[in-house]
Structure formats: structure tokens, C-alpha cells
């Protein structure tokens, strides 16, 4: 709940990208509810669909619809095949850069 309270004071506009990196943190569903009511451009939660699913269910019970819930990206990052923390961070950063430029991301044709 603390994260949700703090997010209320953050100016979130249509260029804001928010990434939740701890899918086990208390209050994630409440924080996501705050963000989904905003015009944030990108909302991501690190973790598998299995980990994030309970938050989606909780948000649905709070009245959020499919269109709202589709804004939540999870798992995060591009599929670069990496497993180390550095590689995962790179894949998330690359995904955010691709989003910045409205690109699907992939190899450039030669």
C-alpha cells in the first residue's frame, strides 16, 4: 500500500513508463490500480504471468476491464535469451527503448 500512496503524489503523464521490479512486494495491486487510472505510456511488472496473475484478478475484481489490464506488460523485456540479472536488465531497457520509438523490436534487415 505504501507504493500506491507514494504514486498518488507522482506526476504521471503519457510519456511516463513505470516498471515494477518486485512482483512479491506488498501493495502491487493497489499501486497498479493507481497507475492504470493514469495516462502512463508503459506499465510493466517483472515476473511470469503466474506471478502477476493474482494481481490481475484483484484488479478485475476492483472493476478494471480487459482494456485496462492489457496495459500491464508481463513478463518484461525483449526475448534476448539471457538469464543473468545484467542480461534481464538489458532486455528490459531494450524493450523500453523499442517502446519509446514505437517499434516491435527485432533484427534489422540487411
Regions found by a protein language model. Name each.
Residues 14, 57, 61-72:
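Short acidic, glycine/proline-enriched helix-loop-strand junctions
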Residues 20-22:
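Short, well-ordered coil/turn residues at beta-beta hairpins
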Residues 25-29:
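Cytosolic regulatory regions of ion transport systems
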Residues 48, 67-97:
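Active-site capping/gating segments
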Residues 75, 98-110:
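A short, charged, Gly/Pro-tolerant segment at domain boundaries
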Amino acid at each position: 500500500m505504501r507504493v500506491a500512496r507514494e504514486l498518488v503524489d507522482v506526476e504521471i503523464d503519457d510519456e511516463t513508463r513505470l516498471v515494477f521490479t518486485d512482483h512479491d512486494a506488498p501493495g502491487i495491486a493497489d499501486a497498479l490500480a493507481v497507475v492504470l487510472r493514469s495516462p502512463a505510456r508503459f506499465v510493466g511488472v517483472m515476473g511470469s504471468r503466474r506471478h502477476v496473475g493474482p494481481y490481475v484478478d484483484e484488479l478485475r475484481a476492483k472493476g478494471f476491464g480487459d482494456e485496462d489490464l492489457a496495459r500491464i506488460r508481463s513478463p518484461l523485456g525483449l526475448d534476448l535469451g539471457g538469464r543473468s540479472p545484467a542480461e534481464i536488465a538489458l532486455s528490459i531497457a531494450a524493450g523500453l527503448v523499442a517502446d519509446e520509438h514505437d517499434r516491435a523490436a527485432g533484427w534489422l534487415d540487411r
